[in-house]
């Protein structure tokens, strides 16, 4: 969906807009309009099994990176948005100055979810979001995902839960 892998057939639509594609020399689909693909990618945020937080950045810095550099938000706006989504995933603002290595796996995954939410996407893609967690931490991440589902957020989830 996000063209991390080249599809061989089919179509991708988001909010009624179909991604323009053509077949490449190998018979795989490729996007014909890079700007359209980039726009769609900003609306499809991914949360991975292994959090993918930058270890050299604080929680707050991890969350504001995309909104500032991709969406063009001012730092103050991005920080406000980051704090809003930290609260949404059940993390107090007291964690915003911590580095990922000082957080539990469940907290790191909730930061990853807050980071994706800070982009305010149309669709959230979750790839095994709980499989790298200790069993006692799975519930806190599932609770956040359930909350997102209850508010009507579109999510595509690959999981063994």
Q: Can you say where each PLM-predicted feature lies in the sequence?
A:
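Helix N-cap at the start of a conserved alpha-helix in ABC-type nucleotide-binding domains
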Residues: 135-137
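Conserved ABC ATPase "signature" region
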Residues: 17-21, 28, 75-94
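H-loop/switch region of ABC-family ATPase nucleotide-binding domains
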Residues: 159-160
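Conserved ABC ATPase signature
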Residues: 99-103, 107
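Catalytic Walker B motif of ABC-type/P-loop ATPase nucleotide-binding domains
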Residues: 124-127
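Helix-to-loop junction immediately C-terminal to a conserved catalytic motif
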Residues: 2
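Conserved catalytic motifs of ABC-family nucleotide-binding domains
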Residues: 120
């Amino acid at each position: 969906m996000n063209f991390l892998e080249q599809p061989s057939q089919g179509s991708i639509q988001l909010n009624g807009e179909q991604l323009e594609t053509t077949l490449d020399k190998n018979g795989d689909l490729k996007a014909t309009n890079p700007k359209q693909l980039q726009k769609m990618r900003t609306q499809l945020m991914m949360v991975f099994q292994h959090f993918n937080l930058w270890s050299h950045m604080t929680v707050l810095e991890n969350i504001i990176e995309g909104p500032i550099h991709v969406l063009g938000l001012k730092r103050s706006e991005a920080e406000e948005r980051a704090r809003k989504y930290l609260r949404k995933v059940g993390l107090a603002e007291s964690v915003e100055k911590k580095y990922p290595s000082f957080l539990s796996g469940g907290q790191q995954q909730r930061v990853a979810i807050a980071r994706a939410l800070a982009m305010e996407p149309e669709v959230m893609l979750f790839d095994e979001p709980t499989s790298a967690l200790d069993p006692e931490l799975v519930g806190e991440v599932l609770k956040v995902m359930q909350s997102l589902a209850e508010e009507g957020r579109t999510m595509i989830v690959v999981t063994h839960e």
